Curated annotation (Swiss-Prot):
Pfam families on file: DNA_mis_repair (PF01119), HATPase_c_3 (PF13589), MutL_C (PF08676)
SMART domains in the record: DNA_mis_repair, MutL_C
Annotated TM spans: none
GO CC list: mismatch repair complex
Xref: InterPro entries: DNA_mismatch_repair_CS (IPR014762), DNA_mismatch_repair_MutL (IPR020667), DNA_mismatch_S5_2-like (IPR013507), HATPase_C_sf (IPR036890), MutL/Mlh/PMS (IPR002099), MutL/Mlh/Pms-like (IPR038973), MutL_C (IPR014790), MutL_C_dimsub (IPR042120)
Organism: Haemophilus influenzae (strain 86-028NP)
Keyword line: DNA damage, DNA repair
Gene (UniProt): mutL
UniProt GO MF annotations: ATP binding; ATP hydrolysis activity; ATP-dependent DNA damage sensor activity; mismatched DNA binding
PROSITE patterns, sorted: DNA_MISMATCH_REPAIR_1
Cleavable signal peptide: none
GO BP terms: mismatch repair
Protein name: DNA mismatch repair protein MutL
Function, in words: This protein is involved in the repair of mismatches in DNA. It is required for dam-dependent methyl-directed DNA mismatch repair. May act as a 'molecular matchmaker', a protein that promotes the formation of a stable complex between two or more DNA-binding proteins in an ATP-dependent manner without itself being part of a final effector complex.
Amino acid sequence: MPIKILSPQLANQIAAGEVVERPASVVKELVENSLDAGANKIQIDIENGGANLIRIRDNGCGIPKEELSLALARHATSKIADLDDLEAILSLGFRGEALASISSVSRLTLTSRTEEQTEAWQVYAQGRDMETTIKPASHPVGTTVEVANLFFNTPARRKFLRTDKTEFAHIDEVIRRIALTKFNTAFTLTHNGKIIRQYRPAEAINQQLKRVAAICGDDFVKNALRIDWKHDDLHLSGWVATPNFSRTQNDLSYCYINGRMVRDKVISHAIRQAYAQYLPTDAYPAFVLFIDLNPHDVDVNVHPTKHEVRFHQQRLIHDFIYEGISYALNNQEQLNWHTDQSAVENHEENTVREPQPNYSIRPNRAAAGQNSFAPKYYEKPQQNQPHFSNTPVLPNHVSTGYRDYRSDAPSKTEQRLYAELLRTLPPTAQKDISDTAQQNISDTAKIISTEIIECSSHLRTLSLIENRALLLQQNQDFFLLSLEKLQRLQWQLALQQIQIEQQPLLIPIVFRLTEAQFQAWQQYSDNFKKIGFEFIENQAQLRLTLNKVPNVLRTQNLQKCLMAMLTRDENSSPFLTALCAQLECKTFDALADALNLLSDTERLLTQTNRTAFTQLLKPVNWQPLLDEI
């Protein structure tokens, strides 16, 4: 078969295979066009799940008569003009493919009128060459797009459509997702002439909460934590649910980049990591998050559906999102959910905020000549917004290189090490201490202190008990080892090393102290520096800036920990013991993770500190139970 240029209709139908997956895809593209046109009132009429009719009516700026024929042409758009615009996209659409692709697989009619025109005009395309026909029509200022008989000329695609109920459910979800990010726009959704959804404009915060409650449910709002987190021109806002409102399926996860619905692995990993210590692996967090950043720092031209994005600084975005959510979860103050005016005051009081230094917000480059799509997050923040004196929690992952998508399964090397750790000693090397097994617990504890811990790997690990302790065996003796106490011992041993590996922070943490706290800091500053912390001190402003932390503590909430250290009773316990007592211990769901902790601690043991490990072993006396059998 010779090489030839495809007809416009066939080329558009091929493109439609990516853009138009189902009726919900059509609704998404057309509603986004309405929003780009500046509409604040959009009506969506659906018949038979969208297979028979999809009608989108808006009150936007409209399309001039002379541009109507281009509106249905492929690669024709008013939203970008050159490569610079493509690298700073602020509009929802920009590819110029949606209308051409939709019109190639349906009977599409577009009616529009601008404010300058005295009459409206209607355009539609038909035939193999997609020739357009324009005629006068009656229509107010704005645009109406009717898509009838979707996939009428591609039977193979049409037969894959699901039931009307299923297809409409997908359309409903698209409108819900868009309504969550466009609070100033009114949406009306009808199906077969019946109003299904109606979202009024939401200007005030209590009105926005009502819309969130209508979409996500009252229970979500009652358990929601407000986030308003900023660093330079990064801005994270929205709501995250407390861990007790976890979901069994990932059905309440809404994330937006510059007002655009996205699915991104970096963002998902940061959110999961922030919830890791609160949720089991089979539970999902609930959230509505808006991430606003300079459009030059994100590439949305990844896929025709524009659901995927790429960040130029993935690590920065990951750690920034983790910080904001972690701080909200660690300082849980739920919204006081009311529908009256007091909801505004309660909402503002319970907003989680980072203290705002005078960051200079860099303006975005205008897209297509004029920045008509610039969202409101680049406006100067209001002066009456409250500010907290607290500072962000330390990022959970600030080391170079991601381990985001590494499998949880142990590697072959780890499996070999686990097997060696679990092996008991040869019979000739085992000490006969069976005589001590019949003595009481106190006598046994005295004997094991000199015999067992000569090498802790002589102990055989039998089981993980309730994710809290390890059951160990040596010959006929059994012991319980608390994993929480083992973690704290590991931290102490690691911080007592001669050379402590430091981890620089991507985003330094600022502490604003009282005079009493600053005096305590001056007393403990040498201790902090000795174990790997690096601060910049500003005595005049009673401020500390944390730049480096011990690598072993990089996953900890050091903001909370260090503030607690500055308010503690100095005579209560030694500095290092008190510091480790403030650290949060992780939970162990797998035996392999607990064995890793035991192995890491063993490597830090020396002849002088083995006694500390010995004291953690609690003998288990099975004799009373055996006597009852």
